[in-house]
Amino acid sequence: MNAVQQPDIAWNRDHLDPGAEQEAVIRGITGEIAGKGFVVANLDRLVNWARTGSLWPMTFGLACCAVEMIHAYMPRWDLDRFGIIPRNSPRQSDVMIVAGTLTNKMAPALRKVYDQMPEPRWVISMGSCANGGGYYHYSYSVVRGCDRIVPVDIYVPGCPPTAEALVYGITQLQKKIRRTGTIFRE
C-alpha cells in the first residue's frame, strides 16, 4: 500500500454540479463552527478597521494652524495613542493634514505631495484659511480653500482650531473610513 491513499468517493450526479459541492462544504464548515465563538467578518470591513488604528499623516503646516497641529502630538492630547504617527515622506503616509493659508505658489507643491501618497489617501483641512481662505480670502495670492487643489474628506473649523478640534476631526475621519466600504477611493 502507498503512504498516501485516495479517499473512497462514490461518484454520483452531485459531483458533477460544483454548486452542490460548495453548499456541502459550507454546511460542513457552518456545522463545525456553530456555537464555538468564531467572528465572521468580510475582508473590506476588517481592512478598514485596521486602517483606522494606524493612520500615518503627512503634516502640511503652512501657517499658525500648524502650531495647534503640533500641540495635538504633545502629552495632553497624544495622537500616538490612536495609532497616528506622523511620517516624513508622503510615500509612507495615508492622511494629509493641511493646516494654514494655502497660497497660489504653494498649491502645486501641495498637489505634488498629494499625488505621491499611495492609495487609499485622505485629506483633513484644518483651519478657516485651509477651508476657505479665512482672513485672507480676498487676497490675490491665496487659494480660497485647499479643496480646489485636492479632494478634502474632513474640514476642521476654527481660527486657529484647537488641538481638541483636530483630534475630533481625526476621530470623524476614522468613523468615515470604517463606514465606507471601499478599499480604493475614486
UniProtKB/Swiss-Prot annotation:
Belongs to the complex I 20 kDa subunit family. It catalyses: a quinone + NADH + 5 H(+)(in) = a quinol + NAD(+) + 4 H(+)(out). NDH-1 is composed of 14 different subunits. Subunits NuoB, C, D, E, F, and G constitute the peripheral sector of the complex. Its EC number is 7.1.1.-. Gene3D superfamilies: 3.40.50.12280. This is NADH-quinone oxidoreductase subunit B 1. Its main location: membrane. Binds 1 [4Fe-4S] cluster. GO terms for biological process: aerobic respiration; electron transport coupled proton transport. The lineage of its organism: Bacteria, Pseudomonadati, Pseudomonadota, Alphaproteobacteria, Acetobacterales. Its cofactor is [4Fe-4S] cluster. One of its GO terms (cellular component) is respiratory chain complex I. Pfam families: Oxidored_q6. NDH-1 shuttles electrons from NADH, via FMN and iron-sulfur (Fe-S) centers, to quinones in the respiratory chain. Couples the redox reaction to proton translocation (for every two electrons transferred, four hydrogen ions are translocated across the cytoplasmic membrane), and thus conserves the redox energy in a proton gradient. It comes from Acidiphilium cryptum (strain JF-5).
